[in-house]
């Protein structure tokens, strides 16, 4: 019984650090607006985001002096503004913390801006991992 106490204490003290990993089907529903945008299929998106963030909406990654946020790993160097990087260009005009929730509306709008400016290869996982053989990424209900 004693080893359970520290685990319980950690889950009470740090409830906000729990990851929210979406399934392919959940993500397909949330990303409807992106399907076919700039000729990128939903299966390409699911594959790319799986290899970018593990489909985790709350993930942050520190990367060469900037931080990347959420399922799309949106950087505070250019796309959003954070406390750590208040000098960001903030092209998406959004606080980075907004990309760490399960409401993907603002994430999708920013992803569309990134796509318009840089294309799908902005997400480095796309070209080597998500350019072909995408059947496994389709939502099958």
Curated annotation (Swiss-Prot):
Organism of provenance: Oryctolagus cuniculus (Rabbit)
Gene name tied to this protein? LALBA
Q: Name one GO cellular component term.
A: extracellular region
Assembly state and interactors? Lactose synthase (LS) is a heterodimer of a catalytic component, beta1,4-galactosyltransferase (beta4Gal-T1) and a regulatory component, alpha-lactalbumin (LA).
Q: Which cysteines are joined by disulfide bonds?
A: 25-139, 47-130, 80-96, 92-110
Main function: Regulatory subunit of lactose synthase, changes the substrate specificity of galactosyltransferase in the mammary gland making glucose a good acceptor substrate for this enzyme. This enables LS to synthesize lactose, the major carbohydrate component of milk. In other tissues, galactosyltransferase transfers galactose onto the N-acetylglucosamine of the oligosaccharide chains in glycoproteins.
Question: Could you tell me what this protein is called?
Answer: Alpha-lactalbumin
Expression tissues: Mammary gland specific. Secreted in milk.
**Keyword ATP-binding assigned:** no
> Main site of residence?
secreted
């Amino acid at each position: 019984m004693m080893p359970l106490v520290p685990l319980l204490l950690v889950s009470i003290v740090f409830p906000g650090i729990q990851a929210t990993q979406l399934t392919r089907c959940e993500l397909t529903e949330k990303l409807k607006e992106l399907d076919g945008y700039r000729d990128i299929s939903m299966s390409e998106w699911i594959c790319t985001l799986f290899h970018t963030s593990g489909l985790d909406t709350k993930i942050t990654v520190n990367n060469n002096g900037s931080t990347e946020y959420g399922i799309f790993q949106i950087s505070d160097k250019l796309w959003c503004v954070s406390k750590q990087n208040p000098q960001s260009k903030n092209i998406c005009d959004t606080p980075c913390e907004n990309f760490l929730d399960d409401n993907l509306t603002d994430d999708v709008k920013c992803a569309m801006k990134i796509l318009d400016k840089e294309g799908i290869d902005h997400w480095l996982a796309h070209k080597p991992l998500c350019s072909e053989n995408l059947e496994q990424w389709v939502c099958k209900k």
